[in-house]
Amino acid sequence: MSSLVRPINLGKINHSQSTVKDYILLMKPRVISLVIFTGFVGMWLAPYSVHPFIAGIAVVCIALGAGSAGAINMWYDRDIDSLMKRTQKRPIVRGVIESDEALSFGLITGFFAVFFMALCVNLLASFLLLFTIFYYICIYTIWLKRRSIQNIVIGGVSGALPPVIGYAAVSNTISLESIILFLIIFIWTPPHSWALALFCNDDYKNCKVPMMPAVKGTLYTKKQILIYSILLFIVSLMPFFIGMNNFIYLIIAGILGVVFLYYAGSLFYDTSDNKQAKRFFAYSIFYLFFIFLLLYSTNTISTIS
């Protein structure tokens, strides 16, 4: 398939307009906040202890790694970002950061994140961080996003790895516990992203990104959201059954999951505008945050010492 990148004129760059805030926005701070939180929970649940200073370095490296991937993603997607309403205010599109500077910033930030993770934490965590950055940029952004309807499903691997990295930073291992953390985010990502695609469908059609609603239609997408929501409900209860979290987790996670299924079912039967998709999208963010907060607060394994 030919490239969907379109030549665009972003206008004259005014370097005096660039601020620290612009570079923070370049790193996708909302994504970073979730990455930091899930990565920290992964560290907390590891059945070993680590010095808080080392844990802090690991968290910073995870954040910088995510930020570097976000910056390079914005560099590569600058053409379609200029066509989508929700991304038209990104720094490169606004012309406050030059595209080459964004690429350099992302590469340098990623290098130091991986380097210091290896130097100060351990090689496994460093390798997983490097793999996550590579996967998000090369597999998702460059290869899948503009070519496959399964872009979110396959590409979701990178977004689900932060708790695995955090767990490995403390334990220097990959275990069943960290795999379950991975699966929770991995299965959560498609319904969350497809709900967004439902109410941003015109944007994705305009820039020819093959999101599921644009290719398969609304009803098919809603069916997939419901299927993944059922799978998520099942996987979200696994931490209790392997002894990672206590009975309180089972009860509250079960309630949160039932509400998630309610929103998915309501979305499936909804024939009106996109209000229900927006409600589901908003709840999905709350759901993931609260599930990981529960994983943190009801664990039965250990804590960082």
From Swiss-Prot:
It is a multi-pass membrane protein. The chain crosses the membrane at residues 31-51, 52-72, 96-118, 123-145, 151-171, 179-199, 225-245, 247-267, 281-301. The keyword Ion transport does not apply. One of its GO terms (cellular component) is plasma membrane. InterPro entries: Protohaem_IX_farnesylTrfase, UbiA_prenyltransferase, UbiA_prenylTrfase_CS, UbiA_sf. The keyword Iron-sulfur does not apply. CDD domains: PT_UbiA_Cox10 (cd13957). It catalyses: heme b + (2E,6E)-farnesyl diphosphate + H2O = Fe(II)-heme o + diphosphate. Keywords: Cell inner membrane, Cell membrane, Heme biosynthesis, Membrane, Transferase, Transmembrane, Transmembrane helix. It holds the Pfam family UbiA. This is Protoheme IX farnesyltransferase. The gene is ctaB.
